């Protein structure tokens, strides 16, 4: 479970931006809250609003880039290969480091992991945990100067195998380091998502191929969404699957006749929901942190709402899955769906071009306040200015 993520000097984010999933004292929708231990409560969903080009997607991009650097395509760079730094561009100052930090729970233990980097090397890296409720260092790194608390000699050997453009959390786990294993596994197993309009079909296809209960869950959701699809089959090769959906028509003699339609001929919204629901069910099964940019893309608002309701329902979300998403859908600004501490905003300063991230709770909205109307009227900022005036709605 993710408690907090912070990012500094990434794309439109110059100064440190923080999103927190720690639950406030809000007494509404308390049944949706999840608990990593007996003392803390977290929210399962965080929604991030903002105008186009405000920088809201850059927060999610940073979180997923952190994963890519730990265990994805940037985890095994060759010597001399450049790191994927995208620093804030609107400044005359020399390029500053970019930094990420995630505070999370895995196996009942709290961890804080972060690092800073430029285009050529990792500048700092650190990992702390709270095994008995007290903070303890696992390792820290400043350039190639390391500090360890356990298995010191062995870890110094692993540090010597860590190139300046690679993370120690990554290389130490290639050598099965027990001190960093669990912190690494959270990133590898629990952090997932996608940006923009990307359609990720791997989870849905895996469920269909497995058949049985896994396929039934996908079909149940497709039927629930009223998309007219009765079955889904996969032919072709694993590398080039051919996905078809079964539709039925009632004939004059009272029987039904089935027709298989290639998924590519379905509406974009249907294709999008199929890709989404596969990832949703996989995340709900594994208790992941699911990061989704533009959650409503091409889908009917009721389908988007249903996906969020699944995460908010404690009877469905039994493994403490979390969802972090960006959206423009003001219909989701509904206090019967989301708590006030689950709604966040991104706003860009037109003078400095910097993105500011802040929570709805900073405005202390009333319990029955119409959040959607207030947002469109500019009460919380983070909206476009059309012709020099704030967009608004009666």
PLM regions: where:
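P-loop NTPase motor core
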Residues: 91-146, 359-368, 374
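Conserved ABC ATPase signature
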Residues: 45-49, 237-281, 289-302
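Conserved P-loop NTP-binding catalytic core
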Residues: 34-41, 45-47, 51, 60-113, ...
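C-terminal lobe/lid and adjacent interdomain/linker elements of RecA-like ASCE P-loop ATPase modules
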Residues: 1-4, 247, 305-394
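Extended helical coiled-coil dimerization/tether regions that scaffold
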Residues: 8, 199-265, 385-394
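Conserved catalytic network of the ASCE P-loop NTPase/AAA+ motor domain
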Residues: 40-41, 93-95, 105-108, 281-284, ...
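Pre-Walker A-like glycine/lysine-rich segment at the N-terminus of P-loop NTPase domains
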Residues: 2-65
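Electropositive, glycine-dotted interaction segments
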Residues: 112-238
């Amino acid at each position: 479970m993710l408690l907090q993520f912070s990012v500094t000097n990434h794309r439109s984010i110059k100064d440190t931006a923080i999103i927190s999933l720690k639950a406030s004292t809000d007494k509404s929708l308390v049944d949706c809250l999840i608990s990593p231990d007996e003392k803390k409560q977290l929210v399962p969903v965080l929604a991030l609003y903002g105008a186009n080009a405000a920088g809201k997607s850059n927060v999610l991009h940073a979180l997923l880039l952190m994963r890519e650097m730990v265990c994805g395509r940037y985890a095994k760079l060759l010597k001399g290969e450049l790191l994927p730094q995208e620093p804030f561009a609107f400044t005359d100052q020399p390029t500053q480091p970019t930094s990420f930090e995630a505070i999370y729970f895995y196996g009942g233990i709290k961890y804080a992991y972060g690092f800073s980097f430029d285009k050529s090397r990792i500048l700092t890296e650190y990992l702390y945990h709270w095994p008995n409720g007290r903070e303890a260092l696992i390792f820290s790194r400043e350039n190639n100067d390391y500090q360890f608390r356990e298995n010191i000699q062995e870890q110094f050997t692993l540090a010597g195998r860590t190139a300046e453009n690679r993370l120690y959390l990554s290389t130490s786990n290639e050598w099965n380091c027990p001190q960093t294993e669990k912190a690494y596994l959270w990133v590898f197993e629990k952090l997932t998502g996608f940006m923009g309009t990307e359609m990720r079909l791997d989870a849905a296809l895996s469920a269909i191929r497995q058949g049985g209960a896994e396929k039934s869950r996908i079909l149940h959701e497709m039927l629930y969404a009223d998309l007219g699809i009765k079955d889904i089959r996969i032919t072709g090769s694993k590398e080039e699957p051919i996905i078809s959906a079964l539709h039925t028509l009632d004939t004059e003699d009272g029987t039904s006749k089935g027709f298989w339609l290639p998924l590519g001929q379905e509406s974009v919204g249907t294709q999008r929901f199929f890709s989404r629901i596969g990832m949703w069910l996989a995340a709900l099964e594994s208790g992941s942190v699911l990061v989704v940019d533009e959650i409503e893309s091409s889908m009917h608002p009721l389908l988007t709402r249903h996906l969020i309701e699944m995460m908010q329902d404690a009877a469905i979300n039994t493994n403490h899955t979390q969802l972090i998403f960006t959206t423009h859908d003001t219909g989701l600004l509904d206090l019967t769906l989301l708590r006030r501490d689950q709604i966040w905003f991104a706003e860009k300063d037109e003078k400095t071009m910097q993105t500011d991230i802040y929570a709805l709770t900073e405005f202390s909205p009333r319990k029955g306040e119409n959040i959607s109307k207030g947002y469109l009227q500019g009460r919380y900022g983070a909206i476009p200015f059309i012709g020099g005036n704030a967009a608004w709605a009666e």
